[in-house]
Amino acid sequence: MGILGDGVAVVQNLVPTGLITAASKLAEAPLGLAEVATRLVEALAINSITEKARRGRRVIVKRRNLHSEQLADLTNLYFHMAEIPIRFWSKVEEWQRWEVGCFEMLNGDRYRAYASGTRCVIAEKLPGESLWEHLNRGTLTRRMLQAAAAEFRRAHQFWSDHFQGRWSHGDGSSQNVIYDSSNNRARLIDFEIVHEKSLATSARQADDLLVFLLDMVGTVPNRQWLPFSTTFLEAYGDREVIAKLRKQLDLPGGLAWIWWGVRTNFTNPAKVKQRLANLSRAIAKLKSYKEAGSALARNKRRPSISCQTIKPGIPTASSRARAIKESAVAGPSRMLRSLPTKT
């Protein structure tokens, strides 16, 4: 049974009345619901997040709130109706596996995460601050953007059995990029949202870049917009993904614009449109966009030790073991190309 129509009764006692009204109206009048749908998106508090000390180390505790599955399903309904190809992990167990697996894949060289009980994920706190904090303080620099781009590029090299392709974040906002100035290193966090499997790899990864850029589009001064955005893309450097990003810079209409409004902090649409148009022209002049060099390499599989799914979101080491076995048969030259690198 769906959430709309008779399905409203399923969540009627679990979420605020205003959200039920919003869900019903989304089906009845999908045009002109900016205010209602915005409240729908913003009101869904799926997690509570606290910082604690455990065994002398600071950790971040993410706890799924009561009725979070129903709230996530309601948000996913909006994404589906607006044709936005992302979704929340609504099942708590699947979210825990994915959150822990992705954190360990990207940050497990120095930091740990684990599921705790039936509703929590605990992760060691990463050093540094989010780039969103730097954006709002006006302390964002090109050096930080280059570090963020390098981390996105590194993360996008990992193989995911869930996608049967290279990994993508799903919510690549600046809030989810932690920058440590002591070693000029950026790291990714927060894996609540996942792209739809139907998206091509380059489209998923381009969406990660787009979400990051949309944070800046309404925040940085006009004189910094193009220098900052092109610095980020040049440092990322993957021609195929950047070409796909350029095709995603047109403003959407209907319900999808509401999500863009959230992403851009409800910046004036005319301002967003102008800045993205300027970026599109600038991309055409980028060296990394003009020169083909990475497309062939991106088609080669580089297995990782995490985010390999035998059920939705379950990491396993089978991909790495399989690749090592195949490489041994193929000879040393193939082994050097196949094994993933870690930083």
Where would I find each of the regions flagged by the language model?
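C-lobe/activation-segment region of protein kinase-like
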Residues: F191-Y289
